[in-house]
From Swiss-Prot:
Originating gene: cry1Ca
Pfam families tied to this protein: Cry1Ac_D5, Cry1Ac_dom-VII, Endotoxin_C, Endotoxin_C2, Endotoxin_M, Endotoxin_N
Nucleus keyword on record: no
GO biological process: sporulation resulting in formation of a cellular spore; symbiont-mediated killing of host cell
Molecular function (Gene Ontology), one example: toxin activity
Keyword tags: Sporulation, Toxin, Virulence
Species the sequence originates in: Bacillus thuringiensis subsp. entomocidus
Keyword Phosphoprotein attached: no
Biological role: Promotes colloidosmotic lysis by binding to the midgut epithelial cells of many lepidopteran larvae including Spodoptera species.
Other facts noted in the record for this chain: Toxic segment of the protein is located in the N-terminus.
Superkingdom classification of source: Bacteria
Protein name per its UniProtKB record: Pesticidal crystal protein Cry1Ca
SUPFAM superfamilies cross-referenced by the UniProt entry: delta-Endotoxin (insectocide), middle domain, delta-Endotoxin (insectocide), N-terminal domain, Galactose-binding domain-like
Family assignment from sequence similarity: Belongs to the delta endotoxin family.
Amino acid sequence: MEENNQNQCIPYNCLSNPEEVLLDGERISTGNSSIDISLSLVQFLVSNFVPGGGFLVGLIDFVWGIVGPSQWDAFLVQIEQLINERIAEFARNAAIANLEGLGNNFNIYVEAFKEWEEDPNNPETRTRVIDRFRILDGLLERDIPSFRISGFEVPLLSVYAQAANLHLAILRDSVIFGERWGLTTINVNENYNRLIRHIDEYADHCANTYNRGLNNLPKSTYQDWITYNRLRRDLTLTVLDIAAFFPNYDNRRYPIQPVGQLTREVYTDPLINFNPQLQSVAQLPTFNVMESSRIRNPHLFDILNNLTIFTDWFSVGRNFYWGGHRVISSLIGGGNITSPIYGREANQEPPRSFTFNGPVFRTLSNPTLRLLQQPWPAPPFNLRGVEGVEFSTPTNSFTYRGRGTVDSLTELPPEDNSVPPREGYSHRLCHATFVQRSGTPFLTTGVVFSWTDRSATLTNTIDPERINQIPLVKGFRVWGGTSVITGPGFTGGDILRRNTFGDFVSLQVNINSPITQRYRLRFRYASSRDARVIVLTGAASTGVGGQVSVNMPLQKTMEIGENLTSRTFRYTDFSNPFSFRANPDIIGISEQPLFGAGSISSGELYIDKIEIILADATFEAESDLERAQKAVNALFTSSNQIGLKTDVTDYHIDQVSNLVDCLSDEFCLDEKRELSEKVKHAKRLSDERNLLQDPNFRGINRQPDRGWRGSTDITIQGGDDVFKENYVTLPGTVDECYPTYLYQKIDESKLKAYTRYELRGYIEDSQDLEIYLIRYNAKHEIVNVPGTGSLWPLSAQSPIGKCGEPNRCAPHLEWNPDLDCSCRDGEKCAHHSHHFTLDIDVGCTDLNEDLGVWVIFKIKTQDGHARLGNLEFLEEKPLLGEALARVKRAEKKWRDKREKLQLETNIVYKEAKESVDALFVNSQYDRLQVDTNIAMIHAADKRVHRIREAYLPELSVIPGVNAAIFEELEGRIFTAYSLYDARNVIKNGDFNNGLLCWNVKGHVDVEEQNNHRSVLVIPEWEAEVSQEVRVCPGRGYILRVTAYKEGYGEGCVTIHEIEDNTDELKFSNCVEEEVYPNNTVTCNNYTGTQEEYEGTYTSRNQGYDEAYGNNPSVPADYASVYEEKSYTDGRRENPCESNRGYGDYTPLPAGYVTKDLEYFPETDKVWIEIGETEGTFIVDSVELLLMEE
């Protein structure tokens, strides 16, 4: 159809770019003055953060010298009109009056400061500047709370940020110049502590109030979104951008100029011609649509390179408009990123592609609303679209269809109005999204531009004269498991988060100095887990690979699930110096578990930025000195160094000593000597409170009753790159019955009643290391600490000094003395740290009992090992409340069990002693009874071993409460064995050594049965076992055999000489009575004979079965006197008993028979032969005993 001259074009108008607005019936002129002032202040903070008169004058020039009551009122109105809420008159008047008073006093303070700068040694100028500082400081402490009056925090927030910034500035002055003014060191430190506290307080208030203000707005319609976005943009510019620079006021962290960057994005109003007073929001998207699809998700910082615009048209009237577009951007150091098509890829005109060779700092747009008349009776069609935009760069302009009147500079004005906008602009265009909604009868399209602050540079260039702050969102690649999340409000942009250990991000840096120069870096981060951050340099362009340059710990700063606040963010110390590999270079950052933490990764790590500084010699020496001073002072409970802090470990002191030793003699020799004396004093205090003897491992087993005792395979080694002093190495063992061990007893005389004590130390690495503390019960921990092999970087060998000693001053992996893993009652470690602690409670002390505390380290596995040192046993704290009641209860239970044990021991000892005495003919224990056999000795030994607590079950070399009586009886048992061996002329008659000393014909076996009992098995009738034995002719002998016959036939044990004089014992599995030559024992009457045998020796040993059975006099529920919980079987047994003890002998199974005969040899040699006629013959033992004369 033909163009209708009645079609109307309504110009962009009203609230999108107001000249004036109506609030509560009162007309108020606005001009974004608060935004102008804030942008100028941010530009000043970015480029001129050096303290002194120049900085103060800048604050006057940009804020406090030009803003009067009307301007402060405009600050308030700026927010009031957005949230449609007026501050109460009393609060408004008080705030403006206080701001005016602060401005006046600040001007007086600046005058006094400048006078002092010109004449710093004049007492009058020093006194005046101190007075003016204290007055202004007091006013700020008083008045700042008036800018956060409950109910009006949001409209007051922009003036709160200005006052907070002023307060931090003058506090920094007092910390830097205070001592030169005449303030004491204590005053200066108190001001510094207030400065740090207020940095967090002010930043958190700004972020929290910003979020609360946005959350309180309605969120339904398009117009709601317009208000929401304007408030978000204005509070970002006037509050959050300023708060992002608050941490830079920490002059001890930033002794030189930091270079800050703001990477956040702000959005100008959508280019849609809409008048909410005249038109319906039904033709526009809802709040949720605008927020979810027109606002970008958190992402890496990108740079706009190209914008391709597709033109669409509406057939009625042939109206052309911006129908869709595509954005091509790039990451710093990365390739191009092409966005999806926004809107529609229309082709009513050829696409217009704009490649910008510089930042777009301004747009002049033409959003229109055309009321198109359609054929009757159709209503007019509302067509909203963008019919033209001009994009301006500092050197050129790019126009799409035509230039408009909607100027982006009205919403984002320049930061410097003294120069043309192409030089003084504040923001650059970074992206564009698209709005579209259609219906009857309307079509609404529009564009939303997003902008980044000019301070975010287009390269990550390292300025050697400044501390370079690089937000990690300026990387070019995030790895799986890493995500970009919305920043908490005070970081100046988005941040990175990682939930699991692994690669974090890769970024490219440009070096503005020789490639050989060395640098240091640190991180600003928050974390709900302890971890390590690895920095690799020289990675490939893909971010893969590289060489480890920095490896430093990140200490946990928050709990899992805790909200991010300024207080949860911390800084690492500057790393050791490193060098870049190329220019530009690729930095790879990854998060790894702490040494010994395994794969545990619960929690999250958030990183805001990395900070890089040139490591010149002076700065390096000053930084090292500051770090050493901080570490030394942190050792003591007070500035007079009277006492050590309880949590300062001996290992910690050694590492602080290394820091001091590595200080430069050239730059700080006097300070180094002073700090060295303090560290030596700390070491002496550590030695004094340590109750262990010989904690430095001068020797093991040097003295029988004191110091360390240990197995012979333990080695003592001198200091290395991990330990400064001696440490011990415990190897593994092939037999758990013979563990590697190290122990020491803490004497009762050193202990205080009702006190908790702590064992702690440092483990370089360990596997299956068992640690015990024993008093009333056993505190036990198995510690596995994977070692690093060295503290030096993976790319370098451990440096050594000129004499072969470890060079502890060479660059190495960062040491964090705060990392610890304490294993206490009711707690379990998430992982095993190199630092270990184990505590034990002491109740009443008794020097007569001398219970003391046993400290034991043990390894009982073949793969086990440990390297440990800096061991301490020290008083932790007195027991109170529940802990006191618990130890009293444990002590009572221990004493009750001790009494039960004593009663039991009296009974068991009496029975065991009677059994042992019955083996001998007299009390001199030098002759055995004639009829004493091996079973009787075993049975007596079994009864002796019923005496409990002879040795500690945790380590059987340590004597227990019944050690004396046990060793008394056990010594007599060994005497019995020796006398018995001397009397028995047959060698290896119990087959414990296999077939040693026996001659074998045919196939025979020695088998272990019933818990290591060795028996001879003759399975074939043609097999024979024999032994030649020397005897005394004319003397009498007893041949005694214990054996068992399976199946038919007979088993025979024969004794004979060369020609004659033969006798034998026969064994069969028979039913009928058989008579054996020279032996009256038969199969049918064997049981009766055994009963007679038992009756004969009632007062002595009662045979295998009875002797190895349970003793009903022993309480079945008796628990260990040492470890109440770990042992519940009624016995605290150690499975590793003596090889000659009862542990290797168990009761004979039913069916075994013991037979004997008397034999009188006529020559000096006899032969013992064992065989059978059929079936299987099993022999337990063969004895040939010399009769007593």
